[in-house]
Each structure stands twice: as C-alpha cells, then as structure tokens.
C-alpha cells in the first residue's frame, strides 16, 4: 500500500492564504518530559489591540507517537492559512491520541491548548470568548466532550468525516443551542457514517442547531483527496458557518 502523502493541501483556496502571519512551534503544554506544540495563524495586518475569534483544528487518530506531527501536515497548514485569510485566527496543535485508550489524555491536551490561547489572548490578538472547534476523523469524540461540558467560550463545533459518539443526552440539554456543522463523506467507512447518521438523528430529535452536508462521492479526507466542486462547496460553507457563529451576539 502506498504511503499517505501528508503534504497534500485542501482543495479549496482563497486569496491571501500565503500572506497570513504564522507563529510556529509554540509550546502550549509540558508533560512528562514532552513539549506539545501549536502553530497560530493570524490575518495579515492586525493592529496591536485587535481581538479576533479563533478556530482550533483538532486532528484525528490514533496516530503513532513517532509519526509526523499533524501541525506539519499540509491539510492543517492550509486550513490554518484559510481561516486566517478569512479573517479569523487559526490554531493547529498536536495532541496525544496515540491509541484508542488515549482519549482522556487527548481531551486534557485540547483543554490545555484552548487554555493557553485564552490566557495569552492579548499577545495573540484573539478574543478569548469566541472559539470554534473543528474536529476531524478520530478526533470526533473530542467534539462530543465539548457538548457535554459546554464551556461558554465555545461558540460552535464542526466535524469533518468524524467518528461521533452518541450524544442524545447532551443534545437535549446543554448542547441544544450550540451550533454544529457536520460534513459526511458518502464513500467513507460504513462504521464512521453510521455514527454520523446516528448523531444527526439525535441532534434533530433534540432540536439542535445543526447544519449537515453530505458529499455523495466523497472519500474519507475528501477535502484533500477529491478536488471537485462539492468538496470546495463544503469547505467554503464550513468556514462561513464558523465566521457567523463565532461572532454571534445572541448568547
């Protein structure tokens, strides 16, 4: 089997993606001798007192501990550039989902990443109270954790071709008013799509604020693998969804 090409970028582009400001290899957490790193993508030309909403990109897994860090993958480099060129701050970061037994540790890493950015809001030009989490693939359970905890600074959640845990109770209570965007790949593994379909049914039963887009011919990773209009439409709609909901004032 051919090795995965980790340099592949998303198939959707906007002007200015290469002009954004990037802080690379920022240490957001020390733990057991490990340094966990993030990259922070900001719009070009921000004034010193600017406060911009932020999108965190939560990679999937499990991935081997010695694998290329997700912050270096083309998909997350280009997503960071995309949201920064679209007027938001993008944060990509490495978390430690190395095995299926690591979800609690990965959750603590996600919490540490958000806390680092929020506690350095002035330095990073971010609005600490306007955050979106965008999860991918095996990172989906980290999104359903946010539905359970519902911190007030999280304004919306997005998930692309993600394994999603049952969330009926959360969607009927704390998560009912939290905007959620789901992107489904029609040619994905049946197990993954079964979890997405169940989540969508639960969200609708709970009258959640849900947007769901399906790519009928899309593969797992359609945003880098399938260079077609439907892939570009879904990515563009997801960015627009984040732009709208992180700036909403009715919460």
Role assignments for model-derived ranges:
Residues 1-50:
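N-terminal cap/lid segment of alpha/beta-hydrolase-fold proteins
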Residues 112-173:
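Primarily recognizes the serine-hydrolase "nucleophile elbow" in alpha/beta-hydrolase
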Residues 183, 197-200, 204-251:
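C-terminal catalytic histidine-bearing segment of alpha/beta-hydrolase fold enzymes
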Residues 52, 58, 160, 215-218:
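Alpha/beta-hydrolase
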Residues 94, 134-136, 158-161, 183, ...:
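Alpha/beta-hydrolase-fold catalytic nucleophile elbow
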Residues 58-60, 184:
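The conserved beta1-alpha1 loop
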Residues 156-206:
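The feature captures the conserved acid-bearing segment of alpha/beta-hydrolase catalytic domains
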């Amino acid at each position: 089997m051919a090795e995965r090409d980790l340099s592949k970028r998303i198939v959707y582009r906007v002007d200015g993606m290469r002009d954004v400001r990037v802080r690379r290899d920022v240490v957001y957490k020390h733990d057991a001798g490990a340094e966990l790193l993030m990259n922070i993508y900001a719009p070009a030309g921000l004034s010193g007192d600017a406060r911009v909403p932020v999108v965190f990109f939560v990679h999937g897994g499990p991935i081997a501990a010695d694998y290329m860090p997700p912050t270096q993958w083309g998909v997350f480099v280009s997503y960071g550039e995309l949201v920064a060129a679209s007027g938001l701050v993008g944060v990509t970061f490495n978390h430690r989902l190395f095995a299926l037994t690591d979800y609690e540790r990965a959750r603590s890493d996600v919490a540490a990443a958000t806390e680092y950015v929020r506690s350095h809001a002035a330095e990073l030009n971010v609005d600490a109270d306007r955050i979106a989490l965008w999860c991918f693939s095996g990172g989906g359970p980290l999104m359903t954790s946010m539905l359970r905890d519902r911190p007030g600074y999280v304004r919306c959640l997005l998930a692309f071709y993600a394994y999603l845990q049952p969330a009926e109770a959360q969607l009927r209570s704390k998560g009912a008013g939290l905007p959620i965007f789901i992107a489904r790949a029609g040619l994905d593994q049946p197990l993954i799509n079964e979890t997405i379909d169940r989540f969508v049914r639960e969200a609708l039963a709970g009258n959640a604020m849900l947007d769901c887009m399906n790519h009928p011919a899309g593969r797992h990773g359609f945003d880098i693998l399938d260079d077609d209009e439907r892939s570009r439409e879904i990515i563009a709609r997801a960015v627009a969804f984040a732009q709208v909901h992180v700036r909403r004032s009715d919460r």
